[in-house]
């Protein structure tokens, strides 16, 4: 099971797009991943680290995407891990 973390913040339209993509893929089923959303503004260290990079997606602890991600690219990255 792959672990996916989406670093995001309120009011970020690109974050909303990536979140919708992950939710759609999760709902579709058949993929071996779980995901969680983390608000970078909830932690000063995360805010400093990702302030200008959200959304950022990590798969199994490794940065896979920042700013944009589509279904096809996510599926490729998931299979490559």
Spans of features found by a protein language model:
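Local sequence-structure signature of Cys/Sec-based thiol-disulfide redox active-site neighborhoods
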Residues: 1-24, 28
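Generic recognition of short, well-ordered alpha-helical segments
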Residues: 17-20, 45-49, 69
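Non-catalytic, surface beta->alpha helical segment in thiol-disulfide oxidoreductase systems
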Residues: 59-81
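Structural micro-motif
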Residues: 51-57
